[in-house]
A protein has these predicted regions:
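Post-HEXXH active-site segment of zinc metalloproteases
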Residues: 171-188
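Bacterial Sec signal peptide processing site at the extreme N-terminus
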Residues: 22-35
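Metzincin-family zinc-dependent endopeptidase catalytic domain
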Residues: 51-159, 167, 171
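Hydrophobic helical h-region of N-terminal Sec-dependent signal peptides
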Residues: 10-14
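Fold-level signature of zinc-dependent metallopeptidase catalytic domains
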Residues: 36-52
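C-terminal motif of bacterial Sec signal peptides marking the signal peptidase cleavage site
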Residues: 17-20
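Walker B catalytic acidic pair
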Residues: 163
Length: 188
């Protein structure tokens, strides 16, 4: 029953994304280019990730990305640890994205899922800020997200769709109901 509710929420969220946001790149009107290509999404776990969380995430992803697959586990590199925290381990999301870029091909989107705390150094005037997810750039096809901050799988899946939107070329949207709205460092 819970998976069905998440699927309904995700379908509504995807409708919002597609209905209220625009790609950052021009859309072709050529009939030969209008064919919908469903990308292959390769999901890597970063560090230890609960099997139930992996399964729930993959079930929800497959609703929108039928070519989604678990691609393997990547050890959380010590080089990604921030030196700005002393109370617990936090990994720099930008460094994790650089690691994930090595697994990217032209025909895939690569996402990393972790249960570890992730963040960015020198983010919005703060020495270090914890975040829920980060795409490596608009349209780059690489993103990382963490279950550390989101409140439950529903919010985690929203973060996942938001970062996948960036990875596929979507920018932030001013509409507060849109999945691509900017959280501005908050927890929506």
């Amino acid at each position: 029953m819970n998976n069905r509710i998440f699927d309904i929420i995700l379908l509504c969220a995807l409708s919002l994304i597609l209905g209220s946001c625009k790609k950052s790149t021009p859309v072709s009107t050529s009939t030969t280019e209008q064919k919908s290509v469903v990308p292959v999404v390769c999901v890597y776990t970063l560090g230890a990730v609960n099997v139930d969380l992996q399964r729930a995430m993959m079930d929800s992803l497959r609703v929108h990305y039928p070519k989604c697959r678990m691609a393997g586990n990547i050890h959380l590199p010590d080089s990604a640890l921030t030196t700005k925290r002393n109370d617990h381990k936090r990994y720099r999301a930008d460094v994790l994205n650089k690691v994930l870029c090595h697994y990217k091909s032209d025909s895939t989107i690569v996402v990393g899922l972790t249960q570890a705390d992730i963040g960015l150094d020198n983010f919005r005037g703060r020495a270090h800020s914890g975040i829920m997810g980060l795409a490596s750039g608009i349209g780059t096809g690489v993103a990382v997200f963490s279950s550390y901050r989101p409140h439950g799988n529903g919010q985690l899946f929203s973060v996942m769709l938001h970062e996948l939107g960036h990875a596929q070329g979507l920018r932030h949207c001013p509409d507060i109901k849109c999945m691509m709205q900017n959280a501005k460092g908050g927890n929506p």
